[in-house]
């Protein structure tokens, strides 16, 4: 047979706990304030260009929209357009920057594959690539060491004249 125990009721426990503790009151505005540090990036709005008026030289670029309050970024919000080849250059420069700065723990994933098919300008293929680039850039920009220490990342995301 189990020995009998006396239990405090929930209200008694809650009353005794709350009466001895001072709680910080949060207002509705405080709860929904901007986070202390944030970086939001989205790859969106693909646009296919016909520079010579025909299929030769066609390319698609993507808008990169950024909102941040991180001190390493010069603008709180920005919008730039980038081609796939710009992403390739960015990845190459980022790897070089990491090698020179002794950050061996940071590995940069491969970009989504290059599209070599004749239907590379179809809406479905462009959307698939956009999603892949969005996921890839989010993983790169989401790394804390890159957010705070990569000048190449900042230039790629915010400088409209990014050339490497």
Swiss-Prot record:
GO terms for cellular component: early endosome membrane; Golgi membrane; retromer complex. It is found in: Cytoplasm; Golgi apparatus membrane; Prevacuolar compartment membrane. Gene3D superfamilies: Phox-like domain. The gene is SNX3. It is a peripheral membrane protein. Residues 40-163 form the PX domain. Belongs to the sorting nexin family. It comes from the Eukaryota. This is Sorting nexin-3. The keyword Mitochondrion does not apply. It comes from Kluyveromyces lactis (strain ATCC 8585 / CBS 2359 / DSM 70799 / NBRC 1267 / NRRL Y-1140 / WM37). Required for retention of late Golgi membrane proteins. Component of the retrieval machinery that functions by direct interaction with the cytosolic tails of certain TGN membrane proteins during the sorting/budding process at the prevacuolar compartment. Binds phosphatidylinositol 3-phosphate (PtdIns(P3)). Keywords: Cytoplasm, Golgi apparatus, Lipid-binding, Membrane, Protein transport, Transport. One of its GO terms (molecular function) is phosphatidylinositol-3-phosphate binding. Its main location: cytoplasm. The PX domain binds phosphatidylinositol 3-phosphate which is necessary for peripheral membrane localization.
